[in-house]
Amino acid sequence: DRSSAAIPDPSQPSGWRQLTGDEVGSLLGDQKAREVVAVTEPADLPSQMLANSIVSSRLLSKIAEDLGVGHTNTLTGFKWISRVPGLVFGYEEALGYCVDPDYVRDKDGISASTKLAALAASLKSEGRTLQDKLDDFAKKFGLHATGPLTIRVEDLSLIAKGMENLRSEGLKEIAGSPVVKTIDLAEGSDKLPPTDGMMYFTERDDRVVVRPSGTEPKLK
């Protein structure tokens, strides 16, 4: 149910670099959006939806806006992504991709791997690589760097206490940049149902999402 990929990188000791889930998601999402644009009337494009979880990169939303297709964020998990009306592509940063929801309306590593291989082959025929495509995104939309941090605990009560402290005390600064906006995901919104989590935005537009794992004794 997952798809992982590595690309040649001479700067790495192994000669290879593993792509992040967000990098693969942006590559596959852009590929799918372009396929949709080629066969869809312009007036219908906003109903053709790209989707990703709230803990995934914001890059896909910019790709969607640039190409004129729709985009939405969902809670973590494909039970949410797969429910998006008009879904044509969905992903989450934990290496899960839905590239053909008409046939497999769930994360599917086999179809995602074949689509990524096809994209790599198409780029190769042009004398380009997947890294070149990622560089195109950075030049057009700005660099989107993402990184997960997981804290495993033995005492589950520590997770609840940690989330309680974040809500009661808040954060004023992250990595030297003042926090300018805080969203308590437990309050829900007109776009998202309530979930246990906090989202922070800093003055330099960094974004940090803190949430408990839904399946393991971890804070992510």
Residue ranges and their predicted role:
Residues 1, 5-17, 27, 35-212, ...:
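Phosphate-binding and adjacent anionic-ligand microenvironments
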Residues 21-31:
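Catalytic or ion-translocation cores adjacent to nucleophile or general acid/base/metal-coordination motifs
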